[in-house]
Amino acid sequence: MGKSTAARMVVDTLAAAGLPMHATAQPSRAPLGELARHGTDTYRGMALACLCAADRHHQLEVEIKPALRQGKVVVCDRYVASSLVLQGLDGLSSDTVWQLNHGVYCPDLTVILNADPQVLDSRLRGRGGHSRFERAEDNSDMESGLYVHAVVDLQAKGWPVATLDLTTDTPDTIAARIVFLIRRVLQEKSPACV
């Protein structure tokens, strides 16, 4: 199970429980996001980082903030942590990524899904890589390590982070754990909400 599958399952579960939900992903489906999503073979380093950050800033203004103002719970499949990792794979420093993402919202919860690199490689071989990052040989070791660094970086900046290991858990178990974490955050914010 990957990040997108987990996000869909979480949104479906919370929506079925009656919570007003807004599901989104990054890169977005806006033109900037599509350029970033389909341009990983063309754009690298700072160019790709700028595309991803521009898409994130745009999406925040036109999609995420309006959904939050409407009282919806927003679940975003990928956010700043993904940029810290992917742009890190391209050799950019986390400081550079943070500069490009200055002013983005700090979410109420960031969930990092990671797994044993061999398991990640096996899953990617099974479904095929969608981007040059996923198609690269043995990239999972480096990606997993960068996610560990991203967690430390996010926490140092005051972002609430939970890390879940996908190595052995089923998709249903992972989704249930994320739903529990979101419900706990919502309960802390507004007990009447959940």
Residue ranges and their predicted role:
Residues 9-13, 118-194:
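NTP-dependent small-molecule kinase module
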Residues 19-99:
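ATP-dependent small-molecule kinase phosphotransfer cores
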Residues 28-30, 80-81, 115-121, 169:
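Conserved nucleotide-binding/hydrolysis micro-motifs of P-loop NTPases
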Residues 72, 108, 161:
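Conserved acidic residues
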Residues 76-78, 103-124:
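Conserved phosphate-donor/acceptor-positioning beta-strand/loop module used by diverse small-molecule
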